[in-house]
Amino acid sequence: MNATPANATTPVESKDIGFIGLGNMGGPMAANLVKAGHRVTGYDLLPEAVEAAAQTGVRPAASAAEAVAGAELVFTMLPTGRHVLGLYTDGGLLAAARPGTLFVDSSTIDVADARAAHDAARAAGHRALDAPVSGGVFGAEAATLTFMAGGEAAEFAQAEPVLTAMGRKIVHCGPAGSGQAAKICNNMILGISMIAISEAFVLGESLGLSQQALYDVASTSSGQCWALTVNCPVPGPVPASPANHDYRPGFAAPLMAKDLGLAANAIREGGVDAALGLRAAELYAAFAEGRGAGEDFSGIIRAIQERSGRDTSTADRSAGTPGGGAV
């Protein structure tokens, strides 16, 4: 495994890039490629997404095939493996690209689908990487994503200088599918962590502990983690967290449910004893189908509060120092 920090001071040769999927993640990623001096042609099924990307310098295409014609690299950021494979094959994306094009799929999909996409690209005379990301919309906008890449070393070496325009950390995880494997495992850690933190805040409140006091202890002790210090599920301690903005997503709960579903499938198929991963998948699936459909994944604390018979406003109501202190 090779890990490379992005270096914005290193000149990067300008590339012709096609970008398919210009939504909440793909749009900012394509914009950062333009900022880095690349020539980007983009397409999305939603005209408003294409129009928004055009405002950032992305050349709009009337079809996916038009977006990839003449491209040296093609990025895809799509909802599921079914969408990726369908676009590659039945959608004609591989056929429309010039021979030897490098396809980089940054969607979060099943490992088997990632390997199938890689094989389809190779069979059509192209090269491929699976390169999902971590960092959410904020990371996409700030060009601070982590890329987890799976594929051959030569393909990674070609893509790496381009990935640095969108990410802060670029990791070559191994052969095809390894990037998706890393993403699934990472988000299983994240989902379990958020549930544990949320349960701890609800338990602490029931014991008369203020949310700020628990944060002050856990954030400087062995309980410290990203889900606490960056995406804290209660309002007050971390002003930029979604909890302070009515749980408007950064990383939407349905996306966490999707990723944990992929992890649960892999757990079952691999015969792995991962009880917490399976339970986290169940909890997020239920949350995403209900009140969490439009919320950040940290909003799961309100589901835990409801099941515990607590007030779901999440304001710091418990004894001790009130919430709202500085980080």
Where are these regions (language model features)?
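NAD(P)+-binding Rossmann beta1-loop-alpha1 motif at the extreme N-terminus of oxidoreductases
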Residues: 2-77, 96, 101, 106, ...
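Rossmann-fold dinucleotide-binding core
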Residues: 17, 87-89, 109-187
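Hydrophobic beta-strand scaffold residues
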Residues: 40, 60, 128-129, 170, ...
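Rossmann-fold NAD(P) dinucleotide-binding segment
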Residues: 64-127
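Helical "substrate-binding/catalytic lid" subdomain
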Residues: 179-279, 283-308
